[in-house]
Amino acid sequence: MPINCKAKCGKAAALKRPKTGDALCKECFFAAFEAEIHHTITSSKLFRRGEKVAVAASGGKDSTVLAHVMKLLNERHDYGLELVLLSIDEGITGYRDDSLETVKQNRDDYKMPLKILSYEELYGWTMDRIVSQIGRSNNCTFCGVFRRQALDRGARLLCVDSIATGHNADDIAETVLMNVLRGDTARLRRCTDIRTGGGEDSIPRVKPLKYSYEKEIVMYAHYKKLVYFSTECVFAPNAYRGHARAFLKDLEKVRPSVIMDIIYSGEQLRFKDTAKNPVRGTCNRCGFISSQQPCKACVLLEGLNRGLPKLGIGKKSKGDRMIAKQDQELALRERANLVKNDF
């Protein structure tokens, strides 16, 4: 016997919402999913009329659903926003080159301007080349740092007021767990914030999908027949986040509400008044936001260019010793060449 839609629309239920357990027809699920995102946007005052917003587009399910819903809600509720797509090409053969085709399809489907920036043009390196130097153990460190700054660079080029990212509830819960396990109180303080950055020297980032479950995003994309790229990054299996994700999935089996529980716990965390956070400023080399001098992106890039790819991995003191040692070796080499030329 078919189950009726809980919204009492008279239709048979087509699915069960992972977030609430409600049996709904497709149309009522769409309405509920979109209404929740609209509530998140309006209650958190993420945007103001007349603003230009860059939607971070990767071609994956999250960014595709974000672009679709942002366009839909902007028109339905008259937000008055100018929406553009911003995509970063990390230079990963067999992954990003294919996903960018999906991003271009999103551009055509949603009639949004698209800007693509590559690591190669920004840093002179692709992730494929970086991995050939560093190996697969720390590649996500490079990619994450470069990608965050690349989005800032792209946003500045586009002169946008904010960047909307596709981080969903699962992503945020995983990040809370990762920061707890690593003892990273600085990131733990801000990882549940729906808006980060902002101020004179940085463009704020917002997370309209903060309370949207990954499973529901997949269901929405599936039933809406949205075009998205579903292949996982070829370097992702070695990421530390994967362990947090697996742990979260195990917890979800025994406590279905654990994703929202972790997010709410992260939002309510209190820290000692004596706990110190790094002061966020701007990098004295590249001019982009940073809590260290020089910024992590500049340190990693310097290491690559010096032939010391592990320069930015680990403590700063270790990196300083590596630079000092290399400079000393270069000086000795130059001195030896001068002596040789004298003869």
Swiss-Prot record:
Enzymatic class: transferase
Coiled-coil region: none
GO-annotated molecular function: nucleotidyltransferase activity; tRNA binding
Transmembrane segments: none
Cellular component GO terms, alphabetical: cytosol; cytosolic tRNA wobble base thiouridylase complex; mitochondrion
Subcellular localization(s) per the UniProt record: Cytoplasm
Keywords attached to this entry: Cytoplasm, RNA-binding, Transferase, tRNA processing, tRNA-binding
Pathway: tRNA modification; 5-methoxycarbonylmethyl-2-thiouridine-tRNA biosynthesis
Keyword Zinc-finger listed: no
GO BP term (any one): tRNA wobble uridine modification
Pfam annotation, one family: zn-ribbon_14
Alphabetical list of SUPFAM superfamilies matching this protein: Adenine nucleotide alpha hydrolases-like
Enzyme Commission identifier(s): 2.7.7.-
Entry function: Plays a central role in 2-thiolation of mcm(5)S(2)U at tRNA wobble positions of tRNA(Lys), tRNA(Glu) and tRNA(Gln). Directly binds tRNAs and probably acts by catalyzing adenylation of tRNAs, an intermediate required for 2-thiolation. It is unclear whether it acts as a sulfurtransferase that transfers sulfur from thiocarboxylated URM1 onto the uridine of tRNAs at wobble position.
Similarity-based family: Belongs to the TtcA family. CTU1/NCS6/ATPBD3 subfamily.
NCBIfam families the UniProt entry points to: TIGR00269 family protein
Protein name: Cytoplasmic tRNA 2-thiolation protein 1
Species the sequence originates in: Drosophila persimilis (Fruit fly)
